[in-house]
């Protein structure tokens, strides 16, 4: 990125979830992915910048940041978001994390909100943690916009269940969380908050600026299968 080199990038998905690769239609079978690299078409995609550090598709904090990697994929394939949320609640209860809160001020789209949160993420992917549609069904990987979901600290287990139900149904106007589409997110906290970037520990920070880097990379894709790139921009 810093060098300004514009050579197309090829992706061999070898991770646990491969959310980013699946969002742009890269096959999970490695030989097929290699064929896309050799014979595909380069297309521009957006990435994110987290206080100047680049990430591919998700920056997150809070109680649900590790559970997706421990949830059985077959269970998720069968039950989707329900499996993810059930595992998340179980893990959070076991660790006592639902008693933890992050007091954060968020600036986005000309708005300023301050609240107590148990989870938040800024993402650019058709799936997060292997769950399709978690950030909505109209995500585009190259529109200059990321999606942000921030879950308020529930006052009771009943409210927590209502929150999860609303999230599963994608009722993004529900009172339990905030949902934004933006190219720029700013976070201000009283104490350091640990974040994950693309599923890896990203450090603990107080003041955070997350920005979209539009059309940052050219990636080799199979144009017919790049679901998250319906508005493709050629090289």
Q: Which positions does each model-derived feature cover?
A:
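Catalytic core of DAGKc-family lipid kinases
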Residues: 2-122
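Glycine-rich nucleotide phosphate-binding loop and flanking beta-alpha elements
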Residues: 18, 128, 193
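Short, acidic/polar N-cap/turn motifs at the starts of alpha helices
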Residues: 44-47, 101-103, 117, 136, ...
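Short beta-strand-to-turn element immediately C-terminal to the catalytic PLP-Schiff-base lysine
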Residues: 50, 70, 122-123, 149-152, ...
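Glycine-rich phosphate/pyrophosphate-binding beta-alpha loops
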Residues: 60, 121-137, 201
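Short acidic/glycine-rich loop or secondary-structure boundary segments that cap or lie
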Residues: 65-67, 114-116, 127-132, 156-160
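Gly/Ser/Thr-rich active-site loops/lids in small-molecule metabolic enzymes
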Residues: 75-83, 128-131, 136-155
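ATP/nucleoside-binding phosphotransfer catalytic cores, i.e., glycine-rich phosphate-binding loops
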Residues: 108-109, 114, 140-143, 150-235
């Amino acid at each position: 990125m810093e060098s300004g080199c514009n050579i197309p990038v090829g992706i061999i998905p070898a991770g646990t979830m491969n959310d980013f690769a699946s969002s742009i239609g890269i096959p999970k079978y490695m030989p097929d992915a290699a064929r896309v690299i050799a014979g595909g078409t380069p297309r521009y995609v957006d990435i994110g910048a987290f206080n100047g550090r680049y990430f591919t598709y998700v920056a997150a904090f809070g109680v649900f940041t590790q559970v997706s990697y421990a949830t059985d994929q077959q269970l998720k394939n069968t039950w989707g978001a329900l499996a993810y949320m059930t595992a998340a609640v179980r893990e959070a209860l076991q660790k006592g994390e639902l008693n933890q809160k992050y007091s954060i001020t968020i600036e986005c789209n000309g708005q300023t909100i301050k609240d107590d949160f148990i989870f938040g993420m800024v993402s650019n992917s058709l799936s997060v943690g292997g769950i399709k549609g978690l950030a909505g069904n109209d995500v585009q990987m190259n529109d200059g916009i990321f999606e942000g979901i921030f879950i308020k600290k529930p006052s009771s287990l009943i409210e927590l269940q209502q929150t999860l139900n609303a999230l599963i149904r994608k009722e993004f106007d529900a009172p339990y969380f905030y949902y934004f589409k933006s190219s720029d997110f700013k976070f201000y906290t009283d104490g350091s908050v640990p974040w994950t970037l693309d599923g890896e520990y990203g450090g603990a920070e107080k003041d955070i600026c997350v920005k979209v880097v539009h059309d940052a990379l050219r990636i080799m894709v199979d144009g017919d299968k790049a679901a998250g790139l319906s508005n493709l921009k050629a090289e």
